[in-house]
Structures are given as C-alpha cells and as structure tokens.
C-alpha cells in the first residue's frame, strides 16, 4: 500500500471516529450530571469592562453566517451583558400537573434593553446544553469549526456556575426571592465567560442574533425560533397565497421583530430569507380559524400573509401580543393612515434643497456618492453608466458615473440599482447593456431589471421613478434620470462643438475669444477641400504633432487638428471618450499626444467672458462650452471644452438614440444639428424623509427579488430599512439645504411594488394643493394630459385648476395660473411634415386638456369668463437660439420638469407627469416629495406684505429669472407673482414678444398660423428671415429676453391628431398615450 493510500485510510478513520464521538456527545444524557460546581467569576471582556463599546457596522447585515459558526459577531465588543430577574409569574392549574413559574429577565447590552420570559425547565435545558458543550470542547475532533472553537477557548476557564437543584414545587412562596437571586447570579456569571456567552445555545436562550445590536436597525425587538409556512406572497397573476395544505411546507426559521419590519433568517446559513414591512394594513391574528393551523399566528401586511406555528395556544397568544405591543410602541407612524393616502408620514424639520437643471443636481449626487460609507440605492427609468456628473471634464474619468460606482464598491460600499426593463420593440434605452456594464465592475454592485413582461403580463406600464439614496440618510428625488441628454445648466446651449487653439505670446485672451469663431470657420473651409484625401490629412496631423513637440515654427499652428472631417469619418469606430472627446482627443485616437493631455490636466484653468448679455446673439459665445487655458512647454493652449460627449449630445425629436453600447460615438452631426436643451427640476431630502424614500426602494427591491427566480440567490440580498430613531444622525449633509416640513408621495400598485391596494397620493396631493391655493400656482411638466371625462382621461388635475379659477372669479379674487410645458412632445418625428403618429397623439391630448373640446380647461372657463380667462391662466413653452457653423439656428427647450409651486410656501417635486399614467397609481410607478415651508422671509403677494417660504419662493424666483432672462439682472422686481404689472407687463408680454420674434426670424413650428397639413406644406416652403437677411435677423434676435414663449393654441387645430387606422400606433391601447 502506498503512503498516499495509507494517509487516505488514516484520514477516513479519523473522520469516522470524530463522527462517532460527536454522536456520543450529542446523545449524552446529562441529567445524570451534577448541577453543583465551583462558582467562578470571570470577565473576559478585553481591557476595561467599562470601556466604550464599539458599534457593529450596518454593513454587517450582508455578511451574516450560520448560527453555529464559532466566529460570528453578535455582541458589542468591550461591552458586558447584564441580567436581572424582574419578576416571577406563577401559573396554577386545577389538574394534577404541578404549578409553573415564569421568570421575566431583563437584559442590558450597551444602549439595548430587552426582556425574555423563561421557565425553570428552560434554565435546566440550557445548563445541560452548556455541560454538553463543555465536555464536547475537550475532544480533539479534526474539523475546521471544532478546531477553531477549541483554539479560541484554550486559555479560558471552563468551570461553570451552579444551578439550583431543588424542584420548584418544593420551595415555598417566601423562597421565590432567593430563587430569583440564584438564577440572576447564574446568568451573570455565564455571561461573563465568553466561552459560554458566544455559544449558540446561549444566544438562543437570550433571544439574540447577529442583527440584534446594530445601531441603525433601532431598538432590539423580539426574537426567537419559529416554524413558518411557505407562500402567502401577493404576486400579480399568480395564485400562491398558501391556502390549502397541499401547496405549502413548514420550515424552521429565526424570527426578528424590529421597529418597522419583521424578518426571518435561516439558522443553518444565517441568510435573511424574507423581510415584511410594517404598514397601515399590518394585522396580527391568532387561532386555527384565522390561520388554518393549530397554535397558528397570522401576520398580514399589504404584501403578504405570513403564517407561523407555535408550541401552544398560549405561546401563540404571547407572540402575537408581544409583537403588536412592540410595533405600537416603536413603529406607530407606519400603522397610521397618512395625509393624501401616502405610505409615509409628514415629517417636521427636514433639510431639503431644490435644483433647477441637472448641473447642480448631478454635482451634489457625485459628492454625496463620494461620501457614502455603507449603501447606495439608485433607480431610474433610464441609466447611462458613462455619463459625467461634473462638467466640464477636467479630471479625466473621476466623475464619470460608472467610475464613481466602481470606486465606492472597491471601498466596500454596497450598491443596489433597479432599472426599468423596457419593451425592446418600443424603446431603445437598452437596459440590458446598462446592467451588464455595471455588474461587471465589481461584485458589490447588484442590478435588477423589472418587470418581466411575459410572466407578469405588464407590457404597458413603466417604472418611472428617479431616485438616488445615500446610506438611507440622503435621498435625491425628482425628474432627472442619470442618463444621456439630461445634463444642462442655465445657459441651455444649443451647440457643443469644442475647439483648442494656441495663444501666441503677443496675443491676448480677450482678442482670441472675440476672434475664435471667425478664425475657426475660415479654417474649416480650407479643411473641407482636403477632407476626402487621407494622405494630406494625416500629413497635416503629423506636422501639427511636430509643432506641439516644439519642432517647427509656431506661427504655422492655429488649430489642433482637422477634427471635424476625421470626426465624421471615424464615428463608427469610437468606443471610448478618448477617441471622440474633443479636438485634443483626436491625438489620443492617433497615438500622438496622450501623455501631453494627461500631464496638463491638473493645470487647467476655467475662464468665462467678463461680460455676457442674456439677449440675442451675444449669448452664442457661451454656447460652445466653457473656455479653458493650459500652460505648456510650447506656449498656452486655449479653447473651449465639450460638455456633452458622444451619445450625450442629442436631439431626440430629430433622431432617437441608437447604438448605446458605443457611448462615446456621436449619433447625430453636431456641426449641422443643434442639440435639444433639457430643462428639469430635482430635490434632495435628509433624515426621516430620506428613510421613507429608501423604504420605498427597499420594498420594490425585495418584491422584485421574490418575484423573479434569477434574483433569489444569496448574491442578491434582501434589503433592510434603517430605523427612524437614528434618522437624525446625518453623516453627510448636502450644502445649501433649508429646514421645512416634508412628506413622500408615490404612485404604486401590485405590479410595481407588490402591494394589495394601489396608492395615488401624488394625484391626491396635486388636486389638494391646487384646490386650497390662495394666490397662484406655477406648474412645469413634461405632459399636460388631464380634465377627466371618466372615459379616456381620469385624473382631475385640470379640473381642479378650472374650478379654482372659477372660484376666484366668483369671489372677485386676483389669482394666477402659470403652466410651462414643452412646445412639442419628446418623440422622434419630423414636425415639418406633421410629426410622427406618437408625437401627434400626445399633442392631441395636450390640446384636449388646454383648449380643444368640451372637457378642456378653457372650455370649462368660457361660459362664465368669456375671454377674461386670459387674466387668470397662461400657457407657455421655452425656446432658444444660437449660431452653428455660421448659420442662425433655433430649437425648443425640452421641459421635462414635474413641478408644482403654490403660494410661495408649498412645492411638489417628483417624477410624476400630469397624465393618467403617472397619477392614477395603477399604471407607472412614481415618486415625489411635497415640501411645505416653516422658515419664512418678508415678501409681497398681491401688493400686500407676505411671509413667503424660503424653499418655495427661492425655487419660484430661480425659475422665473431663468425663463424671463433675469438671472444677470436682479434689478427687475418679480417678487409679486400675482400683480397685474408682473403677470401682464412682464410674463405675458415677454412670452408674446419672444414668440413673435422667433416666428418672424425662423418661422418656427409649432405655429398658430398653421391649422392643417396643407397650410403646413405652404408654411415650410416660404423663405425665413434668418437666411434671407442675416443682419435684420440678428437685429430682431437682440430683442429676445430669456427663453419664455407663448404656447401656440391653434397649431393643426383642424386636423385629427389621433393615430389613423392602419398605423401601428392605432393598435396601441389609448391608455398608453394618456
């Protein structure tokens, strides 16, 4: 026999002996052992027992282990566990069975205090387990777990304290105090000995686990081993409620009750197997009739019916009563019906901040992510991994979204992302690419997509929330996806060509700024003549490369490269920002100057022109990017960086996104097509409000994990909500936030969140705020589809607006309604030919809400107001203009906001559009926050002194200054949004003047002159002033102020804009458009 074979036999023999010894010890009848023993007092806590305890990090919830593992952390290090027997309950019986004493034991560990109830027989069973363990630990069994445990307790004393031997029936009433003291001393001594304190029998006796003493999970609640029945989940379209004995099984689980949720764990692996959130439908029932189980306990909420089995009816009653008492004490906010039917309570003293456009929003998200220590939650309708959150890009890829997430994941932060899983035939957002890209960055990044359309039968509705949550303490809520095309600032640039030039020693920065466009244009004309030949182009590049290295005369170099021609030629080969980023990126593509660019990045300096007018063509100097200057060994390189790279430069009405797996390749020609500016609103909340946002995300995540089999593995963990009790402990705070009252709102249903009753609290809040507004409302929204007829449209936002105006008219009150929406829906289509069918369908329902048909707002007003409705309500859009390649161009600014401001004291910001999809709750899932001011500033309203809210008024003034062109002119008085002077002489007048000028110079569409398709064809064939008379056009455009334009009510008013029969859009249910 070989040595290897002999070793194999010996190993096998040892394993057999170990198994036999283990069985022997397990079956040892320890009732024969004496309970008496030498009492030992020992405190094994390291260092001083009174030393400050160390908190168990919240992230440990993702690293739970089997309950019998020897190295799991349960207790706070350096902190003793103190026990006190408070009382004894004596249960008498009329039968011959002896009376039973029930001891109430209060335990304290750091900040945590809890009680357990035990009979004397439980003490005896516990003592036998420890004796068994004491004997077992002496046997050198060759297993990894046993060896580890032996090594850990090698130097520890093993003498156990004594347990009273006499039977409880033998002691008299007056001896109960002594028995209590004996049991208390016994526990105290056991808990001072780590060898026994950390043993799984001890933790089970004390009702503690790995999740008991985590600070952010709140106070320690009830825990214990139970039997639970499978099933009971409310999964749409699937009948698996667990009724009927044929379709369920019983499993042993460790139940944990916290202040706002219950969970149970698998004892063998320590994995969290389910989380049940406390909500307004939380109920506990006991008895066979309610549970279909002997000694059963039933726990209901909006998402599940959970059936537990106890040892006796009394045990079931105790569990039910104890859970209910604990939740009533610590989680009462979650049990109540809240305002507007919301799942979330109203919270006072919440730090909140608003954002107009994505620049500041993205920057604060980037900074908050950088400060994350435990978790990052993200959910979006669309997410583009390669977008830059800080622009211009002067630090390489540091602030690129995927790079931030990877960096934080490497630091140990857990990142959970939920994406809307689109119907690929209808949408091209390619969420599968996003998931694949993010998941391969790091194991700490987990991505789910939902819904599965076939299995869930959900084809028409979408997850539309846009949320970023940091450590469940800071939550960004609004309408801005972390996706292409969303980043914008108050400039709303139309062009983003980018350029880099060299400033010679005798040339000033100011002269270069003034002459940059002209010189670049003249150079581009020369370049075009040789763009079809490879050799001359490459030769000029090599020559330029030599000039950059200091070879040759500097006067021959006026521009980095012939970027434009090569840009068009090489778009399809571009797969990284280094290939198409800017003029300097061309050299990266041709391996000529990558080291130079990286070397000078730290020395970049940003400049802006010393004076910029908000009017006319003088704005175009800011349209191509921010100017930067770089000192190098060959002189100063000066130019304008790009803000939108690759797919981020977009105009989705002109062309929808394609090839998203090539993020840095342009898909439209930025030298001939202006981008579509993006106007949006976001917000951030802290503390308890952020906890509520996280709770919604957690509910959706856990529901998706249950619903989709691929996510049931341990690699996709259940998420746990942090306690509201610790919400005030902010580790990170977004600068610039103010204190206010806040409440979270949502649209959610069975398909989106797994809840029994749908929620439409956003709809309820909108109608309530409008109906109860006293002076004005200001609305920005991507859609305006309302005015219920209970046939096609059901939300009542439009009706509330009309009724509030009628009330103001009847009472002789001055009241204003400001509505800003996109001039065209955001669907691909050529408006010069009438637009696509989808675009026309949305136009139909927008016009139906505003002015066409008996249900429209204007038709509801005219019977009483006639034409006086114009004194109450204004409909506007946004538009801007610029110069692109020597040509005057204009484009609408796409309003994507979901904003309502009322009376300078109430704001609703979220992801919900004004349409049935967003408002009714049963359709798209949405999230919003209503903020009501508690801090005020002196102001004016309707000509009278008024205390305006800091949050609401600040946001309203920022929006007004932006759209009216007053950001750089604070002298204009826009404090009073109700006065005739502001409403008529500033707001209405500016919108009308701007619209008239744009129509005169560009003959813009949509246009009030075009009532049908025949007129449309004639309209687009007429010459436009911008091409016929450049000087006159420029003179007219100098009169433009801001971005505000009147909305054209009569565009295609004689056409039926609904999809015609035979088109694919006509097959789509009407609910898709509304």
Swiss-Prot record:
Stimulated by phosphatidylinositol 4,5-bisphosphate and phosphatidylinositol 3,4,5-trisphosphate, activated by the phosphokinase C-alpha, by the ADP-ribosylation factor-1 (ARF-1), and to a lesser extent by GTP-binding proteins: RHO A, RAC-1 and CDC42. Inhibited by oleate. A lipid is attached at residues 240-241 (S-palmitoyl cysteine). GO terms for biological process: cellular response to nutrient; defense response to Gram-positive bacterium; intracellular signal transduction; phosphatidic acid biosynthetic process; phospholipid biosynthetic process; phospholipid catabolic process; positive regulation of cell migration; positive regulation of translation. One of its GO terms (cellular component) is plasma membrane. Residues 219-328 form the PH domain. The modification Phosphoserine is found at residues 499, 561, 629. Phosphorylated on serine and threonine residues. It is uncertain whether palmitoylation is on Cys-240 and/or Cys-241. Palmitoylation is required prior to phosphorylation. GO terms for molecular function: phosphatidylinositol binding; phospholipase D activity. Residues 459-486, 891-918 form the PLD phosphodiesterase domain. Residues 81-212 form the PX domain. It is a lipid-anchor. Disulfide bonds: none annotated. InterPro entries: PH-like_dom_sf, PH_domain, PLD-like_dom, PLipase_D/transphosphatidylase, PLipase_D_euk, PLipase_D_fam, PX_dom, PX_dom_sf. Transmembrane segments: none annotated. Signal peptide: none annotated. It holds the Pfam family PH. Residues 463-928 are annotated as: Catalytic. Function as phospholipase selective for phosphatidylcholine. Implicated as a critical step in numerous cellular pathways, including signal transduction, membrane trafficking, and the regulation of mitosis. May be involved in the regulation of perinuclear intravesicular membrane traffic. Interacts with PIP5K1B. This is Phospholipase D1. It comes from Rattus norvegicus (Rat). The gene is Pld1.
